């Protein structure tokens, strides 16, 4: 059995930076993590062992933490919620991904220009919640079936950063089709690491019929990778660690693909990879040996993209007409 790794997979710079900030905290017991730092149960367990306090992403989100410091996760929070925490005397350690901040800026810009915002994403997801809390007029669209005819004459469309590009295109087309009367402005807020991983998995699916996807079960981008594999007709196994692999899954399999969401740690991916190689007979060989972002060329491109996005948020010409 051959083991073929996707050319782009695993931790993105937003997750990497959030983990670095958490690692530098000297007194974790004085810090409450506002939600899950990243959607990865192994990271959650590590944070708990270090003594971080934890706020869930559900019903207790409106409560004020007892600790003097609050760590904002890579998924971000609304300006309104951040102001509430500061007014309560909390010091915020903000690890919001730069590209999530871009999505927030896009939403607020549309709001201030009088647009009804259509947010393509998963209802209830913490990133979607954070963006929508700063809006007065909006709808969340998980798929094209949710699109309707709106009475608003100005419609602005943005995306949860981990939305599959194909789904965004489909929903955007449905909005235009059902609202020919409206002025529609679309802003692409899907992050580049998500696009890289989606493109890489498409290439992987041209080579294999069985794929192992590594990442948290509540990670949206990981679930989207698994769903895309399923859509393409592949047999897909979504695991969070190597211990979840079942050798019987690979009976008769000649080649297996390996990909991972942005919350999957490099060491976890490597452990899964080595476990797959151990199942191979004769021993498996990876066609791609250096997954992104260890590849210097891809890392440089991502760094340049991040700097461009930070600059773009501040530019008046940032918004694009559809």
Specify the residue positions occupied by each region the protein language model found.
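The feature marks the mature, well-folded catalytic cores of soluble enzymes
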Residues: 1-322
């Amino acid at each position: 059995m051959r083991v073929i790794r996707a050319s782009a997979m695993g931790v993105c710079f937003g997750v990497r930076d959030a983990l670095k900030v958490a690692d530098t905290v000297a007194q974790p017991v004085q810090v409450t993590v506002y939600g899950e730092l990243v959607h990865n149960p192994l990271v959650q367990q590590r944070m708990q062992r270090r003594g971080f306090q934890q706020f869930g992403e559900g019903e207790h989100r409106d409560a004020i933490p007892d600790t003097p410091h609050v760590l904002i996760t890579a998924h971000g929070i609304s300006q309104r919620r951040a102001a509430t925490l500061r007014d309560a005397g909390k010091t915020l350690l903000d690890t919001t991904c730069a590209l999530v901040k871009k999505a927030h800026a896009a939403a607020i810009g549309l709001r201030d220009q009088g647009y009804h915002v259509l947010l393509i994403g998963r209802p209830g997801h913490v990133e979607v919640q954070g963006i929508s809390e700063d809006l007065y007029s909006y709808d969340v669209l998980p798929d094209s079936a949710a699109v309707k005819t709106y009475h608003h004459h100005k419609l602005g469309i943005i995306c949860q950063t981990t939305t599959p590009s194909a789904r965004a295109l489909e929903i955007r087309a449905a909005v235009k089709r059902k609202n020919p009367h409206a002025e529609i402005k679309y802003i692409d807020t899907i992050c580049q690491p998500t696009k890289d991983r989606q493109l890489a998995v498409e290439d992987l699916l041209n080579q294999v019929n069985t794929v192992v996807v590594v990442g948290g079960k509540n990670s949206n981008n990981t679930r989207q990778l698994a769903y895309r594999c399923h859509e393409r007709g592949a047999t897909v196994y979504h695991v969070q660690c190597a211990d979840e692999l079942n050798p019987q899954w690979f009976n008769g399999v000649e080649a297996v693909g390996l990909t991972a969401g942005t919350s999957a740690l490099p060491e976890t991916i490597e452990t899964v990879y080595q476990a797959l190689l151990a199942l191979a007979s004769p021993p498996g060989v990876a066609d791609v040996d250096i997954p992104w972002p260890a590849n210097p060329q891809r890392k440089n491109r991502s760094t340049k993209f991040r700097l461009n996005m930070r600059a773009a948020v501040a530019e008046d010409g940032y918004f694009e007409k559809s």
